[in-house]
Regions:
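Glycine/proline-enriched, intrinsically flexible loops and inter-domain linkers
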Residues: 1-474
Length: 474
């Protein structure tokens, strides 16, 4: 068996979003030239979206531990102890680029992705929130983006049956070509029923479950790391397509399997799909993986190993299970009508070995891709605080008031909020429409959780540090 060969040139390297220095590092790591499949895997794993190579330096400075922190950065979602045997699992994530290119699907899959991150930890989602920024509302492009994003968020959350209880939306011309779509999900879990993504147990089977793999979203992580403009419409095939009804089946089936003491590790196939989920689980467990790509359920014919590994088809999970629990695992997923296949097993090699048609088509060391992406300290200069100069002039209070309330930022957002079901599950005491924060009750207790999602971009633009402080304070 030999690795599949393919010509790699400077154009292909650039098209994969890799720099010359990064490619030289790849050659140093492998001690040989990569084939196209391997280059594609480096591309997505070392993308800004997956590796945080430009922001990791700064993210490391944030406080991440505390008396009530059960799980900080590094897992699918954060976990906070709320007393007794209860904990809150939460995740907030941006889906800006996909939503700019294809607003409905971009926003919908943003919601779906964070919900999977939350229930992967063993939690049941109890609330969704969002924070949205759009350009000049008089711009037709902005109107189309607003309508698509809001409908995508509402349709996905409503169909899965999770209340969207809060959020915010504002407009400014600076967002004309760079909208922000931040989705948040909150879930409830028992502290003794938390699941993690650390793979362990040499020889343990790796199970794929969920939607069949298609060609949608290939290089979505790389696309999400690039700059874009009005010509980005050509990138629509890289935007994932969501299926909220499949998400509901996946949620309920995973919750059922979690009661069977079958799961050793579980990971959502999010950005970079099968690649990121398999590499991340193996890296955390310091083990290797053998993947048999012929076993991957595909919905399109003649899919290549490159397409299977880089597809970002939504509503998919990868898990390592106990060998004696394979039958109960397949029985549960069959009951829910889901595709579930054994696609590989754990090894002690520290390498990802990918086979297709009985041939070894790719072999890569796991740690350098999952944990050792290049980190950058980008050039920067201190930004002077901006102050708004107010000219002295005679103003009529009535005119000032009318101008303020005529701004779309101060207008009623009822049209937007009414597209979100905030009472499904019947646990919403208050939505943020009714108070400064949404309040969700916790079953079988006298506890409730207050949730808010706010930020003032004017403050952040004027003074980023002070603006960030005020966002936390708010």
């Amino acid at each position: 068996m030999s690795l599949e060969k393919g010509l790699i040139n400077s154009k292909i390297i650039k098209d994969h979003g890799l720099t010359k220095s990064e490619y030289k590092l790849i050659l140093k790591i492998l001690k040989r030239k990569p084939n196209l499949l391997e280059l594609g895997i480096f591309s997505v794993m070392w993308s800004e979206h997956c590796s945080y190579k430009s922001t990791k330096k700064w993210l490391k400075t944030l406080p991440t531990s505390g008396e009530y922190v059960i799980c900080g950065p590094g897992e699918n979602a954060g976990i906070i102890d709320i007393g007794g045997n209860d904990a809150i699992v939460f995740k907030m994530e941006s889906h800006n680029h996909p939503s700019f290119i294809e607003p409905y699907q971009g926003a919908a899959t943003g919601v779906g992705g964070i919900m999977r991150d939350v229930f992967t930890m063993g939690a049941r989602p109890i609330a969704n929130l969002n924070s949205l920024r759009f350009g000049d509302i008089s711009n037709n492009k902005t109107k189309n983006l607003l309508q698509g994003v809001v409908k995508g968020i509402g349709d996905y959350g409503n169909c899965v049956g999770i209340p969207t209880v809060g959020g915010e939306c504002s407009f400014h011309k600076s967002y004309n070509n760079n909208i922000l779509v931040n989705a948040m999900c909150v879930g409830l879990v028992k502290k003794n029923k938390i699941f993690y993504s650390k793979a362990k147990g040499i020889g343990n089977p790796i199970i794929y479950v969920g939607s069949k793999t298609g060609r949608d979203g290939i290089h979505g992580a790389t696309m999400a790391s690039a700059e874009f403009d009005d010509n980005s419409i050509d990138q629509r095939p890289q935007v994932q397509v969501g299926d909220p009804f499949m998400e509901k089946l996946l949620l309920e089936s995973c919750q059922e399997l979690m009661k069977e003491d079958a799961i050793i590790a579980i990971q959502d196939m999010g950005a970079a799909g099968l690649t990121s989920s398999s590499f991340e689980m193996a890296s955390k467990g310091n083990c290797g993986v053998k993947l048999f790509l012929n076993e991957v359920p595909c919905r399109e014919s003649k899919m290549t190993p490159y397409e299977m590994m880089l597809s970002e088809t939504q509503e998919r999970m990868l898990m390592v299970i106990k060998p004696d629990k394979k039958q109960v695992t397949f029985d549960i997923f069959k009951k829910w009508g889901l595709d579930a296949k054994e696609v590989g097993y754990l090894t002690d090699t520290g390498k990802m070995q990918m086979y297709f048609n009985n041939n070894l088509v790719g072999e890569l060391p796991i740690k350098p891709l999952a944990d050792s992406a290049p980190e950058y300290d980008r050039p920067r200069k201190k930004k002077e605080s901006k102050t708004i100069k107010v000219r002295k002039r005679k103003l009529k209070i009535k005119n000032v008031f009318l101008k303020m309330i005529s701004s779309p930022n101060h207008s009623s957002k009822e049209w937007l909020f009414r597209q979100y079901d905030n009472m499904v599950m019947c646990d919403t005491i208050f939505s943020s429409e009714e108070s400064d924060a949404a309040i969700i009750r916790i079953h079988n207790s006298k506890k409730a959780v207050a949730i808010s999602c706010d930020c003032n971009p004017v403050y952040c633009n004027s003074d980023p540090k002070l603006g960030a402080k005020l966002a936390v304070a708010e």
